[in-house]
Design a protein with these regions (language model features):
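Cysteine/selenocysteine-centered motifs that mediate thiol-based redox chemistry or coordinate metal-sulfur cofactors
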Residues: 201, 206-232
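Extended soluble regions of mature proteins
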Residues: 171-181, 207-213
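Structured extracytoplasmic
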Residues: 20-164, 176, 185-194, 222-246
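Bacterial N-terminal signal peptides that target proteins for export
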Residues: 1-8
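Short, ordered coil/turn segments that flank beta-strands lining enzyme active or ligand-binding pockets
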Residues: 56, 172-173, 203-204
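Mature extracytoplasmic/lumenal regions of exported proteins
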Residues: 166-168, 178, 182-185, 196-198, ...
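Bacterial N-terminal signal peptides
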Residues: 8-16
Length: 246
């Protein structure tokens, strides 16, 4: 075989191998770790939540901004302090702190009931870890310097609850995940439509979700509401060595 033909064949094989690794295993491993990194991270951070709820046409708009100081740990994230809370332009920090204290007391008395409520919830299953095999990926063109792939459930898993379809972007050189958008294949009860965007960043050896944006429409019967919720993580203060990301 001529050298030029051999070179072309080698390149073709390399491209085929690369295509079969979209997204790269390293990216998916870091995505899985980053999605839950702060839940058990031994440190504190600030969580700011901005929410806008309105009728589908935008009327009866209700806005709120809550800033909380959080900690991670073996039992999961915990609210240590409500720094501030604004609802409809009014400072309701004192009321929010009172509600938090009431919830803590109720949780201490009815932990089993709370767990039952959590078990009834259906989350959004994203690619990563053991869930990766449930998804099929399609490579996307590089955009703004980021490699990407679209994902959707494989046919044999299409009817499983909680699965999503969407797009994942990662840094082409470092393979760090940058952002992901997803929407449920089948919407949860009471939700007509919903999309999620997660943005990840690296600090030292740890990758974590720094920002999320959730948009959707939900409700019951003839009562429908449009919702837009943003969360941002800031002011990370490790209590010890930061958790490493693969």
């Amino acid at each position: 075989m001529p050298a030029r033909g051999l070179l072309s064949l080698t390149i073709a094989v390399a491209v085929t191998a690369l295509a079969s690794e979209v997204p790269p295993p390293e990216t998916l491993a870091r995505l899985e770790a980053g999605a839950t990194a702060l839940e058990t991270w031994p440190g504190a951070f600030t969580l700011t939540t901005r929410a806008v709820i309105s009728k589908p046409d935008g009327d009866d708009r209700e806005e709120s901004v809550t800033v909380m100081r959080m900690t991670g740990g073996p039992a999961g994230p915990e609210v240590k302090e409500i720094v501030s809370a604004i609802r409809g332009g009014k400072d309701v920090t004192a009321e929010a702190r009172g509600e938090l204290e009431k919830e803590r007391k109720q949780a201490a008395k009815g932990a089993d009931e709370e767990k039952k409520d959590e078990d009834d919830e259906v989350g959004m299953t994203l690619p990563g870890g053991k869930q990766t095999g449930k998804f099929a990926f399609t490579a996307l063109p590089v955009a703004d310097g980021a490699c990407g792939a679209a994902f959707a459930p494989r046919a044999e898993h299409a009817k499983e609850p909680g699965l999503t379809t969407g797009e994942l972007r990662w840094e082409c050189t470092t393979l760090d995940p940058l952002w992901l958008t997803a929407r449920p294949v089948k919407n949860p009860k009471g939700v007509k439509e919903m999309t999620l965007r997660m943005e990840l960043v690296r600090t030292g050896e740890m990758i974590y979700v720094a920002r999320t944006v959730t948009d959707g429409v939900g409700g019951v019967l003839f009562i429908k509401r449009k919702f837009h919720v943003e969360t941002e993580i800031a002011e990370l203060a490790p209590a010890g060595p930061a958790a490493a990301t693969p």
